Amino acid sequence: MQLLRCFSIFSVIASVLAQELTTICEQIPSPTLESTPYSLSTTTILANGKAMQGVFEYYKSVTFVSNCGSHPSTTSKGSPINTQYVF
């Protein structure tokens, strides 16, 4: 009798834990870039016969990964370099 009661309690606990651990598959967001550059570099550039100072901003891509179901999916965006020229 005690053994049946123990199994009954165990099955209730297992059911509650299974509900808590259920994975919810949602649409993953669109890929984005960080709003601030992680690095900057400068160099002197000669363009159209004029010397300029080039400022290069490097951005990291934010990648979202979903491992729901049998087909994992990701969204990512390339890490661009933003170039600015200072005269």
From Swiss-Prot:
Pfam families hit by this protein: AGA2 (PF17366)
Name the record gives this protein: A-agglutinin-binding subunit
Subunit composition and interactions: Heterodimer; disulfide-linked. Interacts with SAG1.
Recorded name of the encoding gene: AGA2
Segment forming the signal sequence: 1-18
GO terms under biological process: agglutination involved in conjugation with cellular fusion
Glycan attachment sites: T22, S30, T32, S39, T63, S66, T75
GO cellular component terms, A-Z: endoplasmic reticulum; fungal-type cell wall; fungal-type vacuole
Protein source organism: Saccharomyces cerevisiae (strain ATCC 204508 / S288c) (Baker's yeast)
Role of this protein: Receptor binding subunit of the a-agglutinin heterodimer. S.cerevisiae a and alpha cells express the complementary cell surface glycoproteins a-agglutinin and alpha-agglutinin, respectively, which interact with one another to promote cellular aggregation during mating.
Other comments on record: Present with 1160 molecules/cell in log phase SD medium.
Gene Ontology molecular-function annotations: cell adhesion molecule binding
Keywords: Cell adhesion, Disulfide bond, Glycoprotein, Signal
